[in-house]
Amino acid sequence: MNANMSRRFAGLLLAAVLALPGAALAAGLELKSEALQDVAVKGKDGKVQKKRQAVTNAVPGSEIIYVITYRNGGAKPAADVVINNPVPPQMVYVAGSAEGAGTRAEVSVDGGKQFGALEALQVKGADGKPRAARAEDVTHLRWTVQTAIAPGKEGSVTYRALVR
């Protein structure tokens, strides 16, 4: 990976980590963000298998898997936990890829002001008229954890994005 791409990708990771909500951190929640890629690795048997590893080369078109792990480091259950995460501007969200066991995932196309299902959202088209939102319009993701997180327990949410 060239130096410019390395700096650019490091900036993407830092932006994603710094944008995690302070409210979640104040509630005793510990958050960790990782950027991973699935790479093809040839095994000893000669078969090619996919292996997930930290991103080492991100070129336009590369698919990055963002994993945000949350852990309740407090002494009490953490309730009403919401994790907001921006999609870095150099990335395009992969529609339908936001996941997390026991969570409800939503997207925003207006800088995180309103959230909902992608198919229910609209943006202003080039002609100034409203049009259905598309994956490339997504600016933020939000996961609402459906149950309280017991002390010491953890979980994770993920999404995929393509490098522009």
Question: Where are the predicted features?
Answer:
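Bacterial N-terminal signal peptides
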Residues: 11-21
